[in-house]
Swiss-Prot record:
Protein activity control: Activated by tyrosine and threonine phosphorylation. Activated in response to hyperosmolarity, hydrogen peroxide, and epidermal growth factor (EGF).
Segments carrying motif Nuclear localization signal: 505-539
Residue ranges of the motif TXY: 219-221
Region (Required for binding to MAP2K5): 78-139
Gene3D superfamilies the record matches: Phosphorylase Kinase, domain 1 (3.30.200.20), Transferase(Phosphotransferase) domain 1 (1.10.510.10)
Species name: Mus musculus
EC assignment: 2.7.11.24
Gene that encodes it: Mapk7
The Protein kinase domain, residue ranges: 55-347
A matching Pfam family: Pkinase
Comment text on domains: The second proline-rich region may interact with actin targeting the kinase to a specific location in the cell. The TXY motif contains the threonine and tyrosine residues whose phosphorylation activates the MAP kinases.
Protein name per its UniProtKB record: Mitogen-activated protein kinase 7
Binding residues for ATP: 61-69, 84
Amino acid sequence: MAEPLKEEDGEDGSGEPPGRVKAEPVHTAASVVAKNLALLKARSFDVTFDVGDEYEIIETIGNGAYGVVSSARRRLTGQQVAIKKIPNAFDVVTNAKRTLRELKILKHFKHDNIIAIKDILKPTVPYGEFRSVYVVLDLMESDLHQIIHSSQPLTLEHVRYFLYQLLRGLKYMHSAQVIHRDLKPSNLLVNENCELKIGDFGMARGLCTSPAEHQYFMTEYVATRWYRAPELMLSLHEYTQAIDLWSVGCIFGEMLARRQLFPGKNYVHQLQLIMMVLGTPSPAVIQAVGAERVRAYIQSLPPRQPVPWETVYPGADRQALSLLGRMLRFEPSARISAAAALRHPFLAKYHDPDDEPDCAPPFDFAFDREALTRERIKEAIVAEIEDFHARREGIRQQIRFQPSLQPVASEPVCPDVEMPSPWAPSGDCAMESPPPALPPCSDPAPDTVDLTLQPAPPASELAPPKREGAISDNTKAALKAALLKSLRSRLRDGPSAPLEAPEPRKPVTAQERQREREEKRRRRQERAKEREKRRQERERKERGAGTLGGPSTDPLAGLVLSDNDRSLLERWTRMARPPAPAPAPAPAPAPAPSSAQPTSTPTGPVSQSTGPLQPAGSIPGPASQPVCPPPGPVPQPAGPIPAPLQTAPSTSLLASQSLVPPSGLPGSGAPEVLPYFPSGPPPPDPGLTPQPSTSESPDVNLVTQQLSKSQVEDPLPPVFSGTPKGSGAGYGVGFDLEEFLNQSFDMGVADGPQDGQADSASLSASLLADWLEGHGMNPADIESLQREIQMDSPMLLSDLPDLQEP
């Protein structure tokens, strides 16, 4: 029997055993718990939003240990956003540092699949009274956890598209040397258009470049156990981006079966579930385990072979299982990277190297390694808010257009010139008198013209004699008035302002491409509906004609084809028909008996049918095969017809496959049950089954069916008609205190996880201890509350009855 494993990892995952505190007497536990519960609700459920007149609060999305998030509408534009309120943000150093870290990271990232900061509200109170931080984020209706564990249809195309967006955002994040460390379905925000964004960067860290940074990496590590990588559980001291790829693999498997892949109830059970599927770790991994007793425990277990993924997910897509197997490996170096996963054949449908950017420059975590006080963290957060608004104001000034106004210079008005009439004789085209010489001017002529009217000369002055056919004074006055009006309008429009440079072409982003694809999909669906309507109308007419004159023999009837495809197939059918033989010469006329009927020699096979005559191309048999090959290749579809998309089974079908931990150590208890996620073979699609045809060319009928399918095929998964409301966990508000405390105090704590209801395991004791640090609670109160709600360390092994210390 394997030696019982004692606790080797502390609450921060660093390997130090946590200190033991004596339990409080039983008769005082109820009063302490009631006091702590009242304090938690009073400090956490503060949903009063003071956002001024710019935003209008709609409803509360969710609340948690770190804040409250509500949906809102911007009054000026009507745009809907999510506003996250972090109350008492500077009371606890851990929470204040988490807020600073998340603000810095989200300001650094600009990606379509990562939640973005739209605004940070400026403090409206003096610095000394500033306590709550308001962050305006993208509004997403739901999260992936709610989608998976609901009745919402989730097809293979949905899984493929969600996984592609997750890996696309992860590639961008990893290129900035950032590890998320807390990827789980509830932290992946989703909307009804199947768009996915990664949220909650409060646990993010940078890459470890030296062994001295391992302790920094594991500090405050309270990620959900079900998605935690083996190197974190075994203290392998190899903390790379592969940690996130393990979490992605667990999420991928959960989407395929709509059930958690490794729902461990405690530390040992989690290791057992992983080894039941992946087998015993390699000797190199076992030797790299940092804790001696953990290494001895694994070595004492009987060797186990890995289970094929086809057995775990029967009937699932082979390419999907191939990618899943490359994500879930014990060795971190053997796991596939996010960039390589995007190139996997399973995601080839969406992969576009030009639309999968990297982040430059890398994010700097130097501030996170410093020992900061609450006052310094508050100053840093205020500086981040001011920097955000300074950058946004600078961008607005760059795109603002203000024409410069300059005074108009004056100059002498040019003397009037007599303009001859166009109908005057050619000899009269010469001017009446040569133009007078302009007075010399030392200054250069200004660029502008004085448009002020000069006073008219006195009427007593003698006008020059007019020639026959010259333009009258009234005409010249009208022309001058028109010219003056034109010049005034040009000056009024700003001729002195510099010409506006042509707007540079904006780069096409993934969101714009997504909108273009959705618009194309909408137009395709409308065209498909129109074609379907015309097809039904044509079938109705054909049925009516068949009732009157017999059934229709058109092999293309009832198919949705474009005009070009239909003309191409008709041409191919004509080319495939054998050429008619030349008519034989008529024999010499001979007298025939008057009683004989005239006969004719048939030029081809005579049909035995007594029905009406049919064209030669429609007579089945060997004679109907094409005699000569067509001049071009047969039109083929771009790829094989995809299998019909199936909806993953509901959780009720998996109730009998519950993963029950063994009552004792491996090898001494009940037989272990492998995780089994039945999905069944995909049912045949009647729309894709080729129907028998009487056409003489079966390949023509097959091509017709394939082209008909290609006319309505949609490359994107169908949008959700309605999405379940999210819990707000993806916005970084922490676990839901209302639900957690109600379950803990009112209903008691269940023996095991409730499938489909929560995607979080027991949290670290440091989470509550840090949260209550500034609220005047003594260690006895904290210990009593921890024991009541069972918020034990994720590495605590003493909660198993069969793993007590000797």
